[in-house]
């Protein structure tokens, strides 16, 4: 693939788009170009008659480890899949069940060997066939450069024969097919490489032509798409991290649809000019305790925090009901969910008693407890691009103050850097799709174990490690579900996490948009079905 520099062009495009956003914030357009942009987005056609679509997203940015669309880098696979550039061997359907996507099917030959047959006729957007050899090369590159994927997939070797790929794992990996539906598993043409701006060649309905991190991504129709007609000719994905700016852009017609809209803005769009597509998801808003913090390492403090967060009010009031209260890591709607789990509930008086018994008292009467001369202050690290997280921080700050805990909020786009320093924070509060693969393994392997890449708080449990070994060698689904429930209960008993709520995810679009459908695993957004009717 030709390497691209184009820094001057990228800068000019960035400035032009910034001007468009600023124009959308005012009551009047400052020139005709903004009017033209708004009209084009609203009608879905440009002057050449091509169908165009503009999508605003608060989360497509470096803050969320999505600086490019290269699935072999960090969490960029999400953007690759969401925006229709890449597709995976397997996918999760609307019922959260695993099914083949660019694969035709698979077979477990023995506990260490899997055979995957690919669909005939699938090709990359450059016209090259997506055969077993191409998939093998892609997965080899993935596990060579992506630490999390290498740990998940446990691939020892592979063999390619036409449309049949045989995978040998180094150890038993019952969830291998689920992991191959993970966004990092987007199959790309690695022979084409990655451009300087992070563009790859996939098998999806759209082809990326231009990417400026934290600003925009441009896509065009894949003329070689293997799975039917693609309706939209050109798409622009705009990074609009500020919720108010996103709302103004959709109102003014600068964009056709939006992801990540602030709940406070929803009433603006509850009319016949707009439409919502919504679904309950497993995206959990959670508190992760830092065991390296002397304060949070105190069992009583973690227990009090768990009892000092009012989950019900957070969902009903601050989220306007667009969510549901969590017990464990997974929603009740899945077989390994939270219906039989026991978690601490909001109980300020019990929290006060726990702290009092542990020696945390308010001796100077300032409302904040102290022990051995140290104030009970919690440094709350979170980030703003998920509109719900600053709301959760403010709610917890209020309720925890009532029990004598001071909360210092740091909502920053630099959270990924800060959390690497365990001395810089006490609790990390984020959002994660905990069962986007239709299987429980991924959450534990990523966040909770000694070898986990996102075990930010250095949590360790002998019991959890033993259960994880058992889970990773168990193929029976019923047994796996029960092990996952036991693992969640261990986390709750240790107060290692507080699972606050699950997201009811919505995308809002103009009324003339069709084929934009929210999905429970939050992976699939811009598909070949997307269309827009002229108004």
Predicted regions and their residues:
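Surface-exposed binding/hinge segments that line
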Residues: 107, 115, 149-191
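Detector for C-terminal structural segments
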Residues: 308-338, 388-397, 419-535
